[in-house]
Amino acid sequence: MNDQSPLVRIEGVSKHFGDTVALDNLTLDIASGEFVTFLGPSGCGKSTTLRILGGFERPTTGRVILDGEDVTFQPPEKRNVNMVFQDYALFPHMTVAQNISFGLELKGMSKADIRKCLDEIMTFLELDGFGARYPGQLSGGQRQRVALARALAPDPALLLLDEPLGALDAKLRGQVQQELKSIQRRTHKTFFFVTHDQEEALTMSDRIVVMNKGRVEQDGTPEELYFHPATRFVAEFIGETNLLSGEMRGQDGDTVMMDWFGQTLSGHAPGGVPKVGDTITASVRLEKLSFHSARPDVANAVQGTVVGKTFLGSRMAVDVMVADAKGAKLRAFVDAETGLSIGSDPTWIGWDSDSMAVLRD
């Protein structure tokens, strides 16, 4: 494959199940060595995409190119692709070593080569000493590593991961997230990860593709999607945000001015906006708002009164009733020890224009 060509190319892929459109003309490239996550709610098309990449489903239209070869109609066993399932799908009657060796035996490797590969992958994934154990004797994190070892041992070009952390408790899930990303970086493998969990996507991914109703809502880095969502769906699905709607007043390059309850606010709109006079909506993340005793020297500033606080450990969520805004509220994250009291004197809240993303819809 040419180094400049994508490892995976999805070209105009649609998938229909009767009258239901699971995927609607999806076109996407994935570079070699990327950790790409498909993120979205149930029924958005992310798992259907994974199954098409793995050869478990055939697209209704379009094609899939893997490493320069059209694999659209190739069965799973003919593709240089492997998969880690949500329940890991380890064979309970086989030892760890036998589970990991299973795919190597199917490839027809010699016993000596299997032994060498097994030793290397078990050392790499810190499974030395576990070879004779059975899956039922392992912790959740250990089973995760065995499933990864089995999937990586045959050296696939693409590894598909179907919500593999869903069965883990919150603490272990956080540990495995870091471990999984570390493994991907060290192996330089291309990971295609499917999840509905925004934290998993933000923590591990080089790139996130947000899906909605079979289509791509937005495709970008975790930082781009979080701080500069393109649509209302992305803004609300990833993290918590303040949504402000008002009339568009004007535009200066990528900066858009809007009227919000009689105050002029400015936001960032790199993707273009409707015409002057139209109603637009903007997103401001909670951590981008700051509190001040006097009007701050920033692009956007409003006055309000603290009406609620929620303790979240190291930080606190503060609700502010904005003055002269017909009951509109803003929510902000502050340090947990910040001395803001409910019903205290009015305070100023400020944020810059780059922190306010004007949405397409």
Segments predicted by a language model, with ranges:
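Non-catalytic connector elements of ABC transporters
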Residues: 241, 250-361
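Conserved ABC transporter NBD signature motif
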Residues: 62-70
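Helix-to-loop junction immediately C-terminal to a conserved catalytic motif
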Residues: 54
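The feature captures the beta-strand-to-loop junction immediately N-terminal to the Walker
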Residues: 39-41
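ABC ATPase nucleotide-binding domains
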Residues: 35, 74-233
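Conserved coupling/switch loops of ABC nucleotide-binding domains, chiefly the family-specific signature
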Residues: 60-63, 113, 213, 245
